[in-house]
């Protein structure tokens, strides 16, 4: 029986949740209409010290090739219709990317936040992979209580480590995107 105590302790250690965020991180505030999202936001997000950079443009266009995210300085959000947002990424050289996003097709609004479509993947199908399991990822965008843009990235996994040890873990990463201007100039 004593042999199983260290193994059980290790399983408990591997199951858990980790959260991180920028200095002076504050919670989400709710918005009533997507018109409130109009504004210009800093592309480079604020995170905990020492963390790799997160760009708002990467959250908006995660699978688009050829975007120099580090060169983009600002993201402009405009309301085009009651359920459509126009988003423009700008650098010092001009517009890098522009797109429209429609509520119900590209995003959902839940509890005063934008929820991007979640992704589910199965990992560990290669023989050398240490974890076999289901991976889940979801991004939520909105405002923090100071009026700045806020991202919460939720990542979770449920699976087996080396096909023997159960694992359930989650990570919440929060990023602040400074709101440079509340209403874009026409």
Tell where the protein language model's regions lie, with residue ranges.
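Predominantly extracellular/secreted and cell-surface proteins with exposed
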Residues: 78-125
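Short, linear, compositionally biased motifs with a strong N-terminal bias
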Residues: 10-11, 84
């Amino acid at each position: 029986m004593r042999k199983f105590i260290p193994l059980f302790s290790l399983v408990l250690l591997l199951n858990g949740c980790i959260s991180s965020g920028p200095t002076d991180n504050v919670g989400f505030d709710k918005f009533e209409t997507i018109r409130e999202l109009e504004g210009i936001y800093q592309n480079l997000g604020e995170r905990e010290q020492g963390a790799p950079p997160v760009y708002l443009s990467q959250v908006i266009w995660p699978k688009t090739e050829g975007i120099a995210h580090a060169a983009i300085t600002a993201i402009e959000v405009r309301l085009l219709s009651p359920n459509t947002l126009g988003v423009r990424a700008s650098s010092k050289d001009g517009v890098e990317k522009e797109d429209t996003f429609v509520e119900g097709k590209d995003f959902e609004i839940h509890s005063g936040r934008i929820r991007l479509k979640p992704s589910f993947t199965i990992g560990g199908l290669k023989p050398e992979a240490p974890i076999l399991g289901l991976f889940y990822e979801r991004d939520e965008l909105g405002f923090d209580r100071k009026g700045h843009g806020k991202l919460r990235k939720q990542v979770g996994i449920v699976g087996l480590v080396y096909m023997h040890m159960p694992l359930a873990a989650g990570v919440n990463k929060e990023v602040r995107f400074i709101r440079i201007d509340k209403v874009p100039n026409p």
